[in-house]
Amino acid sequence: MSPAITEKKRYTYEDYLKTPDDKRHELIDGELLMTPSPVPGHQRISGKLEFKLREFITKNKIGEVFDAPCDVYLDNENVVQPDILFISKDRLDIIGEKNIQGVPNLVIEIISENSVYRDMVQKKRLYARFNVKEYWIVIPEEEEIEVYILEDNTYQLYCAYKKVEELVSPSLKGLKIELKEIF
């Protein structure tokens, strides 16, 4: 007699909405995942990076910047809370009353001890599948930001910027961030 194979429950947006408010959750390919609260170092980097991005976006009047926790509804089985995201002016209609209902132009995830696989593999695949044009992965321990651009439905590394370098965005023309001001 062979053991019974049990299928994993697939969660939906409706299930996601029933999760407790006191925890941060994400829904990736129908799997409900809890995300621990970020540590102070993570928040420090996030705040500085968001400030620089928001300053550029506001000055140039090209869209809006949001930070976590902010739900990004991609479909009924995929709801994420990127650390930072940018939506261009021509796509502001995806900003709903309760969440972002569509694909941001740029997503930034900051790696933490518990999120390496999720951010570098699961979310990278997910964002590519949903056509997020630019994806940054911030690696605090390395004091590095990897910038990826979407080409043929796959992310290609545009550049891995170190702390001593100036980050240049391929899609946000004119954006330059001195990484020594972030790390």
Where are these regions (language model features)?
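Gly/Pro/Ser/Thr-rich low-complexity, intrinsically disordered segments predominantly at protein N-termini
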Residues: 1-183
